Amino acid sequence: MSRGIGIALFLFMGVGAAAQSGQEPPKVVRINDAICMAPLGANVYLVTTPAGNVVIDTGTSADAPDARKLLASEVHGPVKYIILTHGHADHIGGIDLWKETGTQIIAQRNYVELVNFVARLEGFFAPRNAAAFNRPAKEAGLWAGNFGAKIDPTIFFDETYKFTLGGVEFQLFSTPGETPDHLTVWIPAFKTAFIGDNYNGFGEPEPMSFPNLYAIRGTKPRWALDWISSIDKVLALKPEVVLSGHGEPITGNAEITRRLTRFRDAIQYVHDETVKGMNSGKDVFTLMQEIKLPSKFNLTESFGKVSWSVRGIYDGYAGWFDMNPATMYETPPSAVYPDLVRLAGGPDPVVRLALEKLEAGKPVETLHLTDVVLAADQNNRPALEARLKALSYLREHTENYIEAGYLDYGIGKAKDKLGAK
């Protein structure tokens, strides 16, 4: 199991499930005398002061009880504040377990729109999120529809916010990146920055992964230039400790600067190459094929993929219209696929070509050709078998856990059609 795929499992498992899977249950990580970390699918941080506690991110609803249990012995006095670095489910799922009477919950102002956006499209996202981890989910049409989220925060801010608790000053900054509501927490006394998911620890210690500049499950654009600016804000603080939403602490300003600068520069490179290609008239698929990270960045694609990021940047700037008049209309290309099968003399020649493509190391072209056949006959067994082979080939050769999840989903669907288990 790759490290990236192993981390992905933790996003849906608590301590007990992790132990049953053969992974060692996590233990509390002490950062300093005041800061502890529960290293679960998403890290949960506890900052203790003489006047009470501050919790930074709360984990998923599944692993939040484990985080609360892990940190229980470190909690002395009331939980005065909960700070949410952003509104993703793996960071806000444990709010109710930490919230007490009088607890203030802090978020950046764009939090409201983010969680409402997710609630608004719950029926759309639920099966896509489940498919990413090859998990069962209700069909989209079975969701009644939910257009407003529960809003837990009691304090919102735009650009900056600060408070002092027990003599410890907490400074909060708006740092959009993975989400528009993303914030960074800076504790000057400890020279420590909590930066949420604007830096991911997937693949650490080395090599780490390129970020997920676009989430293929479906999301609004993640603006690369905002993300770059946010990393610059963190670097300008000259932190000695950086604590992220996933992965291990980074200590020492030199190492922090090296890692975050490389991370930032890789984002800048992919953004600039995409824009350069757009301005030279290249289409999105050409750029997805052409743009590769130089080896100097030493980043894997176990979490974010460069090709997905290229398309996310391209479509974020330009939208869906590709200047082909045919795409202005509601008729999809698949409407003529049955005609192509008929012109080919039936499905058999198309399936043969699909298998030839697979033998030539072109499994994605195999998938496209099986799409053509299955549009004419969704139960065509040779096409389903060719599709299963192509999906299995891609699954065997990917290092990206998100890609692996959707491939597993596709493999399962093909096997179901074939009656195989």
Listing of model-derived features with the role each one plays in the protein:
Residues 30-31, 53, 58-62, 113-174, 219-238, ...:
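Metallo-beta-lactamase
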Residues 4-16:
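Bacterial N-terminal signal peptides
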Residues 20-21, 123-124, 235-241, 249-421:
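Accessory terminal helices/loops
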